[in-house]
């Protein structure tokens, strides 16, 4: 019975991208920065699986993790790093590429300064949604714009619309005063009118709180993403009668394509609990695919290196629990979709290589080197599960 578990650590880059300078990200290294700024990291299980060796090979710098307690995961692993072929450093590009479909075209983007959005676009959205005007209309940090405009939003009922360095149109609205379903409806309207602009995602950002200093996002975020331009490894497994269990953001990221069961979860603990539970219950010929979004959304973008370190140490502490329930035919992958170095300027993603770690009871230990595309992971999954060979990537099985 063969199963694949993919642990996607959103934004967990390990530096060394050859084209980082092109993105203004020269020297960015999420893991190295978090380790250095916290004077070490207690991640013995990730280290035993080859993370630090992979990271040092990726960027050519020493990762200062410091003394470690004994590892509790004792299982064979292959480790290395993957370079991104896709033109962007965004969530969709990274996820699609690791599933065999690199994004070899350019997304549309909005200018950062006010007004970010074309007048006719906003008029179309407002008219169909039955609203007068919007707030924001610029590139901004999601938490900062709530502090700036949250009270005005509650007072006026105008949704807060903003963008970032990614190909996104984000709409923040109060879950109680504005209404969650109303927010989702406006996002669906915006998604329809954004198609000509080649924008990758519309993101609903519900929040709560009554005044400045109290506003915080809720767990009811929803992403409206365009569909991958070609079938992914998830589609091929589904077509072959297999199971694809998405946990967290995965269902939204792939626009529900190739998913047979979508499980909602948020927060590192709940995402881990759900992953463990689904691994216990999943049948053979399955992919269990979890996006651990907090590394990106809660710590990376907010440049919170202490929070990032705490998240890594917690993630590491749950690995033995997963390893202990693995069956003979299980393969686990640990990877990421891009970087988000919390020591770096700005608040955006950083172009970095990502880990490629594979472990399981029947894996042969070894270094797989630097892979030329994230699609090598998808090709490895396809070969292991005996499904259609992908058009991109080389297996490291």
Swiss-Prot record:
EC number: 5.4.2.7
Single biological process term from Gene Ontology: 2-deoxyribose 1-phosphate catabolic process
Cofactor dependence: Mn(2+)
Pathway participation: Carbohydrate degradation; 2-deoxy-D-ribose 1-phosphate degradation; D-glyceraldehyde 3-phosphate and acetaldehyde from 2-deoxy-alpha-D-ribose 1-phosphate: step 1/2
InterPro entries: Alkaline_phosphatase_core_sf, DeoB, Metalloenzyme, Phosphopentomutase_DeoB_cap_sf
Stored NCBIfam families: deoB, PRK05362.1
Residues noted as binding Mn(2+) 1 in the record, renumbered to the chain: 10, 337-338
Catalytic activity entry: 2-deoxy-alpha-D-ribose 1-phosphate = 2-deoxy-D-ribose 5-phosphate; alpha-D-ribose 1-phosphate = D-ribose 5-phosphate
Top-rank taxon: Bacteria
Classification via CDD domains: PPM
Family: Belongs to the phosphopentomutase family.
Subcellular location: Cytoplasm
Cofactor binding, per record: Binds 2 manganese ions.
GO CC aspect terms: cytosol
Molecular-function GO terms, alphabetical: magnesium ion binding; manganese ion binding; phosphopentomutase activity
Organism field: Elusimicrobium minutum (strain Pei191)
Function: Isomerase that catalyzes the conversion of deoxy-ribose 1-phosphate (dRib-1-P) and ribose 1-phosphate (Rib-1-P) to deoxy-ribose 5-phosphate (dRib-5-P) and ribose 5-phosphate (Rib-5-P), respectively.
Annotated positions binding Mn(2+) 2: 296, 301, 349
Keywords linked to the UniProt accession: Cytoplasm, Isomerase, Manganese, Metal-binding
Name the UniProt record assigns to this protein: Phosphopentomutase
């Amino acid at each position: 019975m063969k199963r694949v578990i993919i642990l996607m650590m959103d934004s967990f880059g390990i530096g060394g991208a050859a084209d980082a300078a092109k993105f203004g990200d020269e020297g960015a290294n999420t893991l190295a920065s978090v380790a250095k700024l916290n004077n070490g990291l207690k991640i013995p299980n990730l280290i035993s699986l080859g993370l630090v060796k992979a990271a040092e090979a990726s960027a050519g710098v020493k990762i200062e993790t410091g003394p470690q307690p004994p590892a509790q995961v004792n299982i064979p692993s292959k480790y290395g790093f993957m370079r991104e072929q896709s033109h962007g450093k965004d969530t969709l590009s990274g996820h699609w590429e690791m599933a065999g479909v690199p994004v070899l075209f350019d997304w549309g983007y909005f200018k950062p300064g006010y007004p970010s959005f074309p007048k006719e676009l906003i008029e179309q959205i407002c008219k169909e949604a039955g609203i007068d005007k919007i707030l924001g209309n610029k590139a901004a940090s999601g938490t900062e714009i709530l502090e700036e405009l949250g009270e005005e939003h509650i007072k006026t009922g105008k949704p807060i619309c903003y963008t970032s360095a990614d190909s996104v149109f984000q709409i923040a609205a109060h879950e109680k005063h504005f209404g969650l379903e109303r927010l989702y409806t406006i996002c669906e309207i915006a998604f329809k009118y954004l198609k000509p602009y080649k924008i990758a995602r519309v993101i609903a950002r519900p929040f709560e709180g009554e005044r400045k200093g109290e506003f915080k996002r809720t767990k009811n975020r929803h992403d409206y993403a365009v569909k991958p331009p070609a079938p992914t490894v998830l589609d091929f497994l589904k077509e072959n009668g297999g199971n694809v269990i998405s946990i967290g953001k995965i269902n939204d990221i792939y626009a529900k394509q190739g998913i047979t069961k979508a499980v909602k979860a948020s927060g590192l603990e709940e995402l881990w609990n759900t992953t463990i539970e689904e691994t216990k219950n999943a049948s053979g010929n399955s992919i269990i695919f979890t996006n651990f979004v907090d590394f990106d959304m809660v710590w990376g973008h907010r440049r919170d290196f202490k929070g990032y370190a705490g998240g890594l140490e917690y993630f590491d502490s749950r690995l033995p629990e997963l390893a202990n329930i693995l069956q003979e035919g299980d393969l686990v992958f640990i990877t990421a979709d891009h970087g988000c170095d919390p020591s770096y300027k700005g608040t955006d993603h950083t172009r970095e290589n990502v880990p490629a770690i594979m472990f399981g009871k029947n894996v042969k230990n070894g270094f797989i080197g630097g892979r030329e595309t994230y699609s090598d992971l998808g090709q490895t999954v396809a070969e292991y599960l005996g499904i259609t060979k992908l058009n991109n990537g080389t297996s490291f099985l």
